Amino acid sequence: MAHLKINGLVQIRSTNRSKHTRASQWKEAVIEIVERKQKVNLVVSFKLEERRRVFQLGDNVTGVVVSGELGLYHLDLTLRDDTSLLIDKLSSADVEHLKSFLDSSTPCESQQPMEPMSSQDDLESSDPFCGEHQEAACGSLNTTPESGTPLSRKMPLSMSNTTGGQKRGEKQGRKRKTEPSSSSAEVNKDIPKENTPDQKKKSRRYYSRNRGGKAEKAVTLREQEKRSNWKLEPAFNSKSYGRANLDGTILPIATCSDDRDVSIFGLEIITHNGVQSLPDPYLNQLKREGFPNLGNTCYMNSILQSVFGIPTFAKDLLTQGIPWEKVSYDDLIMPLSQLLVLKDIRDVEIKGELLTSVKKSISTVADTFSGNEQNDAHEFLSLCLDQLKLNMEKVNAMWDTERRNTCAGSAGTKRFVCPVGANFEFELHSSIICEGCGEATIKTEVSNYLSIDLHHGTKTHPLSIQKSFDLFFTPEKIEHNCEKCKNKNSVLKYTLRRLPRVLIVHLKRYQVTTDLLPVKSEQPVEISKYLNISSHCHENRKLPFPLANTSPDVSQGMMPGIFNQSMLSKKVISESCDPMVLQVGSSVDAEIQSFQIMYEDEDASEEQQQRGLESGSMLEPELVKTENRILRQKTSLATDSMMGDGYSFLPMLCEPLSIQDPGLAEMGLQEVPENPEFKNYEKINIYGKSDGRTNTELSKLYQNHGSRIKGLFLPASLASVSSQEDPEKDLSRSPELQEDDPHSFAFGSDDSKDGEMGDDLQNYRLVSVVSHFGSSPNSGHYVSDVYDFQKQAWLLYSDVQVFESSDPSIQENRLNSGYIFFYMHNEIFEELLKKASECKVLSTSKEEKRDIDYFSTLLNGLTYILEEF
């Protein structure tokens, strides 16, 4: 038998005499299948521990279940002694090979079973075990546990509605219901099939200790690496607050707890040769990574991705010159800003530490977020915005006090704009008019979101976000004691007095039953692409804050100020065209700081960058805290995990930088000419002189004879590197990405009016949707669809995984799950879209930039020598 060796995440489970299941931690390991003395063994060698475990295969195997979702697969191997070996995060090729080896090593079922033989070179006594256990795989190797239908030994990868012994789902005070996966079974996710008595018994056995049936496991961050061909790094153990409440248990493995909703991301299940499998999805998984799940924190990840996807919010938070050295790390604004800067790096450990700090900050005001339980995304959003607003008030108060003490008698002091108030805050004007005397009671409320009721629609008039929004502003008769005439009949009417840049609409999908239990309504609601609010505005309405036409003041708020020196001295490189992402490094091809990417020459020497970082800010010891220890230590690892595909949320700042602080000039920043057509290829020659004419000729020379020059001058190491494909070519090939096509999305019935609504000043356009899959706020899974301005396409964020939809259909896939909707003012949307189209300075790939850098230095030097002669 050929030798097989693959990498994966492994968990070993065993059942003791008391029928209690013990499960080890998930660990990175090398899985090998070897044949010794006519016996086939599976050897698990743990990477971080000098030990291994050996499991005999053959007739010792009682069940093999392969399952997966969105390109990731896991295999559940069950042995006769009730030991289960779970191998997760496998690629399709690895799981095919492993399944083939396991099938070929299993004797015919007609043979007499032998006694279970499971040996090990080293006991796993050091592993902490937990009381939680997922369903084990039962049945023969070639039989699906659900239906008993024989499968071919060379069967394709199974993508059944249930995951076999590893059923993914939630438990809401009822027994599990599974669906058969045989070819004769019709896939119907709305009608769950009943379990057989044996299956029910096993479900009770393995889920009796499930605390609330949480939707996701408390995982180490490295478990969420997407591909096995990526190098697996040591697992990061995130801090867990309130862990004592878990009673020594871990949560079951799942990413979605709704056992009925199989294709939650719009993936259809097809039947092929009697086995349900996954077709090529329309979702294109990107190399970029989202936020790791710390254990039921998908609600936090989805909200943060949606908020970070608002370019104006990012600009207001990062470009005002906030004195970060004065901000406490315990305040939410600090880890939130750091996370925004580093959102697109691949190192999940750094992002995991920052997410833990964000969670801890929110937990100080709401204990419900201190544990590992699933929480409501809307509640987290509300608390997050409130805390951020309070932090900005604290910064302004501190800044005013300091300026008054240092600049006594000055005319005025600078106040920082609150990103929450400038982007999400609106004024809701309510008037209660007495029907008897006409006396009006006026009140104005300030809010960050609008919660609307979920009404019932009909087949002929289906419910939509627009219709629900209109119903909220419909005058309503209420009982109100009039102080003037004592009449109790009044009319309540709402109007919008001040409009926000981004209107957050919260759809009330949860209702409380008579037993005081929250129940989610899955009533379909069509998602309106445009939201027309013109008829609901006050006569003296105030338009949203316009986009600032002046250059941002980065004299004190440049990105290095958010981090301490020890962290910045290490390499933090995010290969992203995100203008807000910190890009610091000493390598030859590392770009300069994030804002320089759009305004400045793309190159800076290592000495210039390091000097700039050291002079950027002298942070107080307040930032050098224990909570930031791992962040500082692990920053150097970000170089190896940098972004490769260069997607971003928007280079929204295209105007030249206005440098006001002389100290900033020492950071290697120079003012860019105001000509927007100025080429980004201008370099600094080796003698420190800038020659625009030479660099223009360099650009033409490289464009016309680039391939020939590469062969003549490039070292072998560089010449052998093939250039990556220009991202702009992808845009030219994809008509739907070239322009903002109002008909490129399959939205609801309101879209017939989209063309007429587009130019209305009171129209808002959808830019993000947070969806919940599940039947309870305490379980399920949250995802977020965010419009990417740079790519001009929709991106789906599901924790660490990021997908691009080539043919988006948000209306179809979020019909029953859409929960929170972000609508941007159409005028601002168009302006940001225009700026994003103009900002194309990062269209060159990493290898092409390296080549240009090399030629720039070489040819500039040659030009200088020729001029001297």
Curated annotation (Swiss-Prot):
Task: Tell me the ranges covered by the USP domain, including all copies.
Answer: 289-826
What phenotype is described for loss of this gene? No visible phenotype in normal conditions.
Reaction(s) catalysed (UniProt annotation): Thiol-dependent hydrolysis of ester, thioester, amide, peptide and isopeptide bonds formed by the C-terminal Gly of ubiquitin (a 76-residue protein attached to proteins as an intracellular targeting signal)
Give the Basic and acidic residues compositional bias ranges. 187-200, 213-226
Tell whether Repeat is among the UniProt keywords.
no
Name its cellular compartments: Cytoplasm, Perinuclear region
Q: What is its EC number?
A: 3.4.19.12
The molecular function GO annotations come to: cysteine-type deubiquitinase activity; cysteine-type endopeptidase activity
Tell me which UniProt keywords the record has, alphabetically: Cytoplasm, Hydrolase, Immunity, Innate immunity, Protease, Thiol protease, Ubl conjugation pathway
Q: Where is the composition biased (Basic residues)?
A: 201-212
**Looking at the record, which segments are called Disordered?**
104-226, 723-754
Q: What does this protein do?
A: Deubiquitinase involved in innate antiviral immunity by mediating 'Lys-48'-linked deubiquitination of CGAS, thereby promoting its stabilization.
Q: Report what the protein is called.
A: Ubiquitin carboxyl-terminal hydrolase 29
The species is Mus musculus
> Which gene produces this protein?
Usp29
